[in-house]
Every structure is written in C-alpha cells, then in structure tokens.
Amino acid sequence: MTIPEPGEPHYSGPIMPPSLSDAPPQRSAGLEPIRILSVSDSESYLKWATQLLSTLPDVEGRVFLIDNPILPTDEQIAGAVAGTDWEHREVPVISRADLAQVIADHSPDIVLGAATGPIVAQVFLTAHTRTNRPALVSGLPGMGLPASGKGMNYRRLMDAFIAHSFAEVAAYTEASAQSQVPCEVLLARLPMLRSEGLPQLKNSSPEATPPDYVTEAAPDTLVFAPQAKVPAERVDREAVVAALAEFADGHPDSTAVIKMRSRPGEFETHHEQHSYFEILDDFRTRRVPGAERIELGYGPLSDFLTDGSALVTVSSTAALESIDRGIPTLLISDFGFNAELLNEVFEGSGATGTLADVAAGSIGFPDPEWLAENYFHAQDGQLRRDLGLLATRAQAGQLPNRRSALFKQKRMLIRAELRTVTPAPVVSAYRKLRRTR
C-alpha cells in the first residue's frame, strides 16, 4: 500500500506510518475508553475538532481532512492544530470515496462530523449505512447563534449536537424541534476556552467594577480579528480599517495588527468579499495616515493574545479566546447587534464600544454576570459522560435507524450536487417557474 504525501487526497488503508495512523496518547480519568473518528473540511472545523478531542479523557481520537474546495493549506493546518495533541502530526487527507473504507478500518464508536453542512451530510450518510453504526455527533467551531434550521437539516442523521452555552442549548433544542431533526443537544465549553472559573482582566483587582475594566493606557498591540461574512458592506470594513489607522497614527509606541485568517489565494470556511488585505492596500495607496503602520498577522491567534495586547472584532469567536486569557476585548457597536451580524449575544456584555473607542485605544472587558451566562459556564466533565453513553449505545446496537431521515438526506444531497453543476440561469428560471405554480 502506498503512503500519501502530506496534503495528497488519497487514503490507502490503515497501514500507515505512526504519524498518520496512530491516535495521540490518551488522557485517563479511569473511564471506559471510546473511539472517535473526526472528519473536517476546513481550517476552523479542524481547529475545533483537534482542540475538542485533546480535552477529552480516555478517548482514542483519529482526525481526517476530506478533500474539498476549502481544504486548508499546510500552513493553515499547522495553525489549526497548534497546541493540540495533533501538533507536529500529519493529518491525512482522504477523498469522499474513501469514507466508507476509513470508517470500516477504524470501527469508531462515534463519528464526529466537524465540517460544513454538506460535508457532514455525506459523512453521516456513509456512516449510517453500516451495520451497528457508530453514533453521529456534530457541532459548530465557534459561537452558534442564531441557530440555523438549514444547518440542522444537513445534520439530519445525527444523534447529538454539541452547543457551547446555555443559550445555544435552548436555541438548538428549539431548532431541532422545528426542523424535525431528533437529536440530543449536549453542552460543552468551546475547547479553546480553558480558564478556571470566570476570566478576569489581567492586572485588575478582584474587586474591580465594570467601569474599571476599561483600559486606562493604550495597548501595546491592538489586534483586529476579522470575519469572512460580517460586516458585509465594504464601507463598513473601510470604517474599521480607518479606526485602526487612526489608532496607529495617534499611538506611535503601539502596534495595530489585522490578524488574517488566510493568505491571499487560501480558502476559508466562508467566502470573503472585500478582503481587508485589499482595503488596507487601497488605504496605503491613498497614503491614509497610519495605514502604513498597520500590520497583517498570520498564524495561530494565541500568538497574538499576549500581555499588553487588546482585541477588537465585530463578532468573531476570537473575542471569547481573548476574554478567556484576560485580554482587554471590545465588540464594535457601530454596526449594531443583530442576528445578521452574528453578534446578538454580546449586546449588554459590558465589552462593547465604538470605532472612536478603537481609535483611542479604550478597550473594555465583559461583566462577570455576562460571563457566567455566556460560554464560561463551569466544566464538570458532562460532555465526556454523554459521549460515553452514546458510545455504549453504539456498541450495543441500540442507536435508531432513521430510514425516513436517510431518504430526506439523500434527496437533499442530490439537490445540492445538482445545484453545483447546473448553470445559474437554469436554476434561476426553474425557481421562477416554481413560484408561478
């Protein structure tokens, strides 16, 4: 059997070098070991999967990437697995045709669909057809509000969905009922959040009150964490870069950084229009004061969340990572807080501020009450117990056989694939015809 080169979309069975086939060493809590096989399609989902599996004791985890248009580059993969059990290990890339063989070779108790909806649907459809099938679990790689019925439909065959806050559990339980996708909604902290108890602003006293959370001095490094989808309008993105340029121009001893998720030409989970790379280049061409002092940063976010730094964003999960480390954090309020911007949860957090605050380097931190209710709940090992129960049910052949859901999933996948190969004018004409019936 041949051994795939790094990044080569081919899998040749279980006989592979240790760096490819062996699961990382297990952490033990005296529980019955379970086998989890994860399939990801993008950098953000790979990061979530490897961090999640690295936090679970008594788990034999194996991680694969599936070949697809948003497959991460070697640099993106290295950044995604940094600090996890998969750091410095090869992540095999498989094709869709390899899925059944991969699952058969490793006989997992649980298949983790850590990927975008259409890929999860393919993975779960393949796994569900096995005799004594594995349990099927999915989730999102960051903040999951608002809950999407479309996302639930792609995951129709799942047995459980992992949510990351009490509000998310409630929202996805409701979405499950409305979409008629029966599944358990499990609660877990986002795996990159590792603070003991509630995070506290670094260098602040335990008695500090919310007004004291705002930094008095400008940060040494002001990091902006962008998102592919929001804000959508170029004018709004230009306003963000303008505020960063004003900060850089007014604070010569500080640094402003746009922490990019990918380099030009690389793919992300979501397509980005009006990239900050292009906008910053335009600002520099027009000689906007301070634009030349804005840096573009690449690599793991953790490299940027250091003492003396502060983070600003519109709604990125990076805000939670920053808060977790006690770093001053600001959610930009100029564009509002709503479902479209994916940032409703931060309204009233105590960590919101304007672009004028960004330019001034006046960055705050969330209220303790908000932290306790949103994403920073206590960790009690319940997720591992829930997964252990699912694994036991899978081993005993007690998982449901959802024949009707299987049919719906196949039909959805056929429609999705036809949509990708059918010319847009034909699809548009077909939709107009349907509306006239």
Model-derived features: where do they sit?
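Short internal beta-strands
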Residues: 61-70, 162-165, 257-261
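N-terminal pre-catalytic "stem/leader" segment of glycosyltransferase-like enzymes
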Residues: 2-107, 434-437
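Conserved catalytic-core segment of nucleotide-activated headgroup transferases in glycan assembly
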Residues: 48, 193-279
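Extended catalytic core of nucleotide-activated donor transferases of GT-like folds
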Residues: 75-154
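Donor nucleotide-activated moiety binding/catalytic core segment of transferases
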Residues: 271-324
